[in-house]
Amino acid sequence: MQILLANPRGFCAGVDRAISIVENALAIYGAPIYVRHEVVHNRYVVDSLRKRGAIFIEQISEVPDGAILIFSAHGVSQAVRNEAKSRDLTVFDATCPLVTKVHMEVARASRRGEESILIGHAGHPEVEGTMGQYSNPEGGMFLVESPEDVWTLNVKNEGKLSFMTQTTLSVDDTSDVIDALRKRFPKIVGPRKDDICYATTNRQEAVRALAEQADVVLVVGSKNSSNSNRLAELAQRMGRTAFLIDDAADIQEAWVKDAACVGVTAGASAPDILVQNVIARLREFGGGEAVTLEGREENIVFEVPKELRVDVREVE
């Protein structure tokens, strides 16, 4: 059985930054550090940080006065941000800069009183945070998930209308929704630069190449990870058997026993140690040496806040 690895896969710059913010805050200030929502959607990462003293909460009211609070990589609404400001808290923002870009687009439309449409998945924390940047009662903010949703919209002024997208969507599905928006609202304005982030696009491109060669595709990522789910869906659309797994223990031998080639990738919030564990598990089932496919090189780095720019080793 051949083992192929998608390239790129795993951590993106936004996830690296968010985890570093929590780790550095723990090193500098000590436990406990409060984090609103899971800092990234990965069980292994969250459990590791929890063991070191991070406390994950959903409501600002759960945070005691004087505590350190970190916003997750998915971003928060203005209402949440304002509630935190009203408290005696030290706040660090781990929102991915590419999510912040979308927040700024929505806030700009809100200031102008222009209606906006967000393409995204209802209930996802990134969507809740992005929708929460709009506050102008003269305009309006709408959420759509599919082309069908577009035709149910009732906007006030089709001449002043813009759209944005969640950063972790399927590139193909989003293209279909955008096509529907442009048909329904010919004057609609989109972002100057695509809102779907580089890491989402690159990992979908990589899993497409992987699925062309593999019989079975394993996607390492947690069930609540949007970008990981999209990778599994894409492999399935290409006619491959695909499984979304948290770790190597999830793999059943029956999944791969008849496969000549198994492909492995990882969502943007899944650490490489989980991929290495998957490779080890597949080798127990008769797999050979893992081979990494060619792919796009990623060199993007997002800096942590200056207050947290410290060599963690200096404070240990």
From Swiss-Prot:
Cofactors (names): [4Fe-4S] cluster
Reaction(s) this enzyme catalyzes, per UniProt: isopentenyl diphosphate + 2 oxidized [2Fe-2S]-[ferredoxin] + H2O = (2E)-4-hydroxy-3-methylbut-2-enyl diphosphate + 2 reduced [2Fe-2S]-[ferredoxin] + 2 H(+); dimethylallyl diphosphate + 2 oxidized [2Fe-2S]-[ferredoxin] + H2O = (2E)-4-hydroxy-3-methylbut-2-enyl diphosphate + 2 reduced [2Fe-2S]-[ferredoxin] + 2 H(+)
EC annotation from Swiss-Prot or TrEMBL: 1.17.7.4
Active site: E126
GO biological process, one term: isopentenyl diphosphate biosynthetic process, methylerythritol 4-phosphate pathway
GO terms for MF: 4 iron, 4 sulfur cluster binding; 4-hydroxy-3-methylbut-2-enyl diphosphate reductase activity; metal ion binding
Residues engaged in binding dimethylallyl diphosphate: H41, H74, H124, S225, S226, N227, S269
Cofactor note: Binds 1 [4Fe-4S] cluster per subunit.
Binding residues annotated for [4Fe-4S] cluster, in chain numbering: C12, C96, C197
Residues involved in (2E)-4-hydroxy-3-methylbut-2-enyl diphosphate binding: H41, H74, H124, T167, S225, S226, N227, S269
Pathway recorded for this protein: Isoprenoid biosynthesis; dimethylallyl diphosphate biosynthesis; dimethylallyl diphosphate from (2E)-4-hydroxy-3-methylbutenyl diphosphate: step 1/1; Isoprenoid biosynthesis; isopentenyl diphosphate biosynthesis via DXP pathway; isopentenyl diphosphate from 1-deoxy-D-xylulose 5-phosphate: step 6/6
Protein purpose: Catalyzes the conversion of 1-hydroxy-2-methyl-2-(E)-butenyl 4-diphosphate (HMBPP) into a mixture of isopentenyl diphosphate (IPP) and dimethylallyl diphosphate (DMAPP). Acts in the terminal step of the DOXP/MEP pathway for isoprenoid precursor biosynthesis.
Assembly with partners or alone: Homodimer.
Entry similarity comment: Belongs to the IspH family.
NCBIfam families linked: ispH_lytB (TIGR00216), PRK01045.1-2 (NF002188), PRK01045.1-4 (NF002190)
Protein name, entry field: 4-hydroxy-3-methylbut-2-enyl diphosphate reductase
